[in-house]
Amino acid sequence: MLTLALPKGRLAEETALLLLSKGWLKNLPSEGSKELTYVSEDKRIRLLFVRSQDVCTYVEEAAADVGIVGWDIIREGGFDLIAPVDLKLGACRLSLASFPDFDLFAKRSKVRVATKYPNLTREYFFSKGISCEIIKLYGSIELAPIVGLSDCIVDLVSTGGTLKANGLKEFESILFSTARLVSNRSSFYHKHAELRSLIESLEN
């Protein structure tokens, strides 16, 4: 039996529907259920529902054989995982945003940046040769420049609607992200036949 870690929320629902269409599930988990695990009727697969930020940890530490998680989280965490399949789900981009009159190169002191992605943000500003001060937040990132906490933000953008609603402009995309199937190295070799079957199902 393969154990698959899924992020709670919309991506878990999309993945469950995908697994249903590929024959890995015969029924969907009960809507609104508080259970954190779900085993398929044929015992081929067990689902774990965890926070998106924890999927890679569950997989890397072999608590799950595989997981589905955004490319942004994989890159930010620097996890030692195999990522064999791009599922093309949950497409979004990690972008630099601020007020329309913001000039990244005008400030002579450090640029103050609010983000949930300190490592990718630091890497981006380093590539530009610009010194930055990272302010790590866990939500409502768009609020930071509005209240003067930061000069700009680096955050995930899907449609840009939240930015526009708060008077902010997207300046540059740093990273394009979609959901990926990831595997820990041990499971990839020791459960290769099962994993290959899952991978082929998801790729077709």
From Swiss-Prot:
EC number: 2.4.2.17
SUPFAM superfamilies, sorted: Periplasmic binding protein-like II (SSF53850)
GO BP annotation list: L-histidine biosynthetic process
Subcellular locations according to the entry: Cytoplasm
GO MF, one example: ATP phosphoribosyltransferase activity
Family: Belongs to the ATP phosphoribosyltransferase family. Short subfamily.
Protein name, UniProt field: ATP phosphoribosyltransferase
Organism name: Leptospira biflexa serovar Patoc (strain Patoc 1 / ATCC 23582 / Paris)
Lineage: Bacteria, Pseudomonadati, Spirochaetota, Spirochaetia, Leptospirales
